[in-house]
């Protein structure tokens, strides 16, 4: 499995805590001593080897990305840190990452993760990811989501034909 971590963003929605140079994914907002980006990276530790992780972020945040990923994976291949000169949102970041994957890995399943999610139940996450990988390798497109507790126009909704 290949993992793509989307670590872009300018940090404007969580102002005054986050700023352009310190967006929320680089902040420690939870009980751990790690940033949301580091927590996301760490969730992959037993699932995806560092050489199969790609990180997309803004070139303005190169130092933070490099420092924080090397704290989690000291041998992380820095050439898999993909730096956007200008952010173009989610789809172009995913496409660029996928085009960067070496030819011999292009048949692997790909999981795309936001760097700023807080996931409390690691066991459920790991189970869902392993099951999702199994389904994806059988030709299914898999998406993960949570049941909304209120309407929110800033998010998409999933109409599920199969609930796992």
Predicted regions and their residues:
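Proline/glycine-rich low-complexity loops and linkers
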Residues: 145-159
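Active-site acidic Asp-centered loop
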Residues: 113-115
């Amino acid at each position: 499995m290949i993992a793509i971590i989307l670590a872009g963003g300018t940090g404007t929605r969580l102002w005054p805590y986050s700023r352009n140079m310190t967006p929320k994914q680089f902040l420690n907002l939870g009980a751990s001593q790690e940033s949301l980006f580091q927590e996301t990276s760490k969730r992959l530790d037993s699932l995806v080897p560092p050489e199969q992780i790609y990180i997309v972020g803004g070139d303005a945040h190169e130092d933070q990305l490099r420092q924080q990923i090397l704290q989690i994976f000291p041998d992380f291949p820095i050439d898999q840190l993909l730096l956007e000169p200008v952010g173009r949102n989610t789809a172009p970041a995913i496409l660029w990452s996928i085009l960067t994957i070496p030819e011999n890995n292009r048949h692997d399943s790909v999981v795309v993760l936001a760097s700023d999610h807080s996931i409390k139940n690691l066991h459920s996450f790991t189970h869902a990811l392993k099951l999702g990988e199994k389904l994806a390798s059988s030709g299914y497109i898999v998406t993960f989501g949570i049941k909304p507790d209120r309407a929110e126009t800033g998010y998409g909704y999933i109409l599920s034909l199969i609930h796992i």
